[in-house]
Amino acid sequence: MLAKRIIPCLDVRDGKVVKGVQFRNHEIIGDIVPLAEQYAKAGADELVFYDITASSDARVVDKSWVSRIAQVIDIPFCVAGGIKSIEDAGRILEMGADKISINSPALNNPELINQLHDVYGQQCVVIGIDSFYNEATDQYEVYKFTGDEARTQKSQWQTIDWIKEVQSRGAGEIVLNCMNQDGVRKGYDVKQLKAVRDVCEVPLIASGGAGEIAHFTDVFQQADVDGALAASVFHKGIINIDELKAELTSNGVAMRKRHGLTAQAEGVNP
């Protein structure tokens, strides 16, 4: 059995970590590097950094903080934001990131997934998907440019179809951001995640909705995701990562021990 991952998410805007509700009304949480170091020491298995306005501002992620993070943490981290070319990705990986994630740029140029896979390997390529449940049509729809309220727009893709497409092009991991649940702390969208799990053959990370420890237990046990990403519950001290992992372990969810990059769960592979 593979060990599951707990992944704090740090949304970055103008050099600060911020957090909104359903991708709106962002408040400043703090500085990037100290927060990264804090989470690494607190027992996080991995970190994800989203420069949330990079794509909508037509720029690549601000790389000035990437190398500083690599110097102070000993766990893997992923960086996202406006990565539109293999050169953009290469510079971020050279600065110490373990993975790069693309979202809107992949929707605009799906061939980019193939290119990144061929140059850097599948293990480096994460696809972020912002999925919105449309009650009127009873469909899950993929949105882009969600970091900028004024530019957010629906793409041509339905979520399940886009999952299949990115896998066929070489995605190594998928982060499903459930927009309806984002920041409201009422639980992950287990129904949608189960539907995605049925077609997703690569590691699947749940994002959006964590509010209490039971929500993590539910998403791991019911949707069989490989990792759970959360922001506000960690930023605001609502959930302690060590306590979360202890509770998950007691509920039969395999978790990694706190040994940085060599972390392993008892009796399982990392």
Swiss-Prot record:
Coiled coil: none annotated. This is Imidazole glycerol phosphate synthase subunit HisF. Keywords: Amino-acid biosynthesis, Cytoplasm, Histidine biosynthesis, Lyase. One of its GO terms (biological process) is L-histidine biosynthetic process. Its EC number is 4.3.2.10. Heterodimer of HisH and HisF. IGPS catalyzes the conversion of PRFAR and glutamine to IGP, AICAR and glutamate. The HisF subunit catalyzes the cyclization activity that produces IGP and AICAR from PRFAR using the ammonia provided by the HisH subunit. CDD domains: HisF. PANTHER family: IMIDAZOLE GLYCEROL PHOSPHATE SYNTHASE HISHF, IMIDAZOLE GLYCEROL PHOSPHATE SYNTHASE SUBUNIT HISF/H IGP SYNTHASE SUBUNIT HISF/H. It comes from Alteromonas mediterranea (strain DSM 17117 / CIP 110805 / LMG 28347 / Deep ecotype). It is found in: Cytoplasm. Belongs to the HisA/HisF family. Pathway: Amino-acid biosynthesis; L-histidine biosynthesis; L-histidine from 5-phospho-alpha-D-ribose 1-diphosphate: step 5/9. GO terms for cellular component: cytoplasm. It holds the Pfam family His_biosynth. It catalyses: 5-[(5-phospho-1-deoxy-D-ribulos-1-ylimino)methylamino]-1-(5-phospho-beta-D-ribosyl)imidazole-4-carboxamide + L-glutamine = D-erythro-1-(imidazol-4-yl)glycerol 3-phosphate + 5-amino-1-(5-phospho-beta-D-ribosyl)imidazole-4-carboxamide + L-glutamate + H(+). One of its GO terms (molecular function) is lyase activity. InterPro entries: Aldolase_TIM, His_biosynth, HisF, IGPS_HisA/HisF, RibuloseP-bd_barrel. SUPFAM superfamilies: Ribulose-phoshate binding barrel.
